Swiss-Prot record:
NADP is among the record's keywords: yes
Catalytic activity: (6R)-5,10-methylene-5,6,7,8-tetrahydrofolate + NADP(+) = (6R)-5,10-methenyltetrahydrofolate + NADPH; (6R)-5,10-methenyltetrahydrofolate + H2O = (6R)-10-formyltetrahydrofolate + H(+)
Enzyme Commission no: 1.5.1.5, 3.5.4.9
Protein name per Swiss-Prot or TrEMBL: Bifunctional protein FolD
CDD domains noted in UniProt: NAD_bind_m-THF_DH_Cyclohyd
One Pfam family, short name: THF_DHG_CYH
Subunit structure: Homodimer.
Single biological process term from Gene Ontology: L-histidine biosynthetic process
């Protein structure tokens, strides 16, 4: 059993980001990410600070817009419009979740697809489904980067994705399909989940339920990727996979923490660099 070390892979990606950011600056372009945070959600504030810190460390300028909880949808859309038109901004990220009075789909649709570094705009979703180049959500993209870094050939594998969210499950399935895996997506209504998982060469768990994937659901030699991040009552951070039970059966497995988590921000930085490079190419 080998550990898939997402922290190490993320550092490699971020070092590459820094090199390319320095190259862009030679052309007079400072790669810039605008981060929009609405409200006082503690987890969101933590994520935004982590994104700002990573940007500053690896050569990307971050511009934060912190808006109050009672910001109206129209006020938020007006800000996004300003950022869309600002040539110095290459990437726009609206931190989710948004307050309940704001329609997330309307807000995401307002972002210029060329600046949609989170990969949530319908144009980029459509490109992913069609196998075309576009921005891809950072977490599933990070999973693919880990698999690539460890030389795990996805083509021809039976892959099971547990979870069908727009942020992880669906894009993960499409990335694996585009890489020629045979993909099954499972969810809360799936029957015979245990049997389906037992046939999988590769399992990606992304449902947000601690210790959901047990050893009796995994065949010997499978690759298991744990996207879950769950905080237990005792303060421990654990994944969707019962690591101690499942790991001995795996050929490769990601830990939590230190697996997929660090890749999300690394791929966000990478997407921001791609947006800045595309801008130069266009000009």
């Amino acid at each position: 059993m080998k550990i898939l070390d997402g922290k190490a892979v993320s550092l490699k990606v971020k070092e590459s980001v820094k090199v390319r950011a320095d190259e862009l600056k030679k052309f007079g372009v400072e790669p810039t990410l605008a981060v929009v945070l609405v409200g006082e959600d503690k987890a969101s504030q933590t994520y935004v600070r982590a994104k700002e810190k990573a940007c500053n460390e690896y050569g990307i300028k971050s511009v934060a817009h912190r808006l109050s909880e009672n910001t109206t949808q129209n006020e938020l859309l007006a800000l996004i419009n300003v950022l869309n038109l600002d040539d110095s901004i290459h990437g726009i990220l609206v931190q989710l979740p948004l307050p309940k009075h704001i329609d997330t789909n309307v807000v995401l649709a307002a972002i210029d697809p060329r600046k949609d570094v989170d990969g949530f705009h319908a144009v980029n979703v459509g490109k992913l489904v069609s196998g075309l180049d576009g921005f891809v959500p950072c977490t599933p993209l990070g999973v693919m980067e880990i698999l690539k870094e460890y030389g795990i050939e996805v083509a021809g594998l039976n892959a099971v994705v547990i979870g069908r969210s727009n942020i992880v499950g669906k894009p993960m399935a499409n990335l694996l399909l585009n890489a020629s895996a045979t993909v099954t997506v499972t969810h809360s209504k799936t029957k015979n989940l245990k049997e389906i998982c037992k046939n999988a060469d590769l399992i990606v768990a992304a449902i947000g339920k601690p210790f959901f994937l047990k050893a009796d659901m995994v065949k010997d030699g499978a690759v298991v990727v744990d996207v879950g991040i769950n905080r237990l009552d005792d303060g421990r951070l654990v994944g969707d996979v019962d690591f101690d039970e499942v790991a001995p059966k795996c050929s490769y497995i990601t830990p939590v923490p230190g697996g997929v988590g660090p890749m999300t921000i690394a791929m966000l930085l990478n997407n921001t660099i791609l947006a800045a490079q595309a801008k130069i190419a266009k000009n």
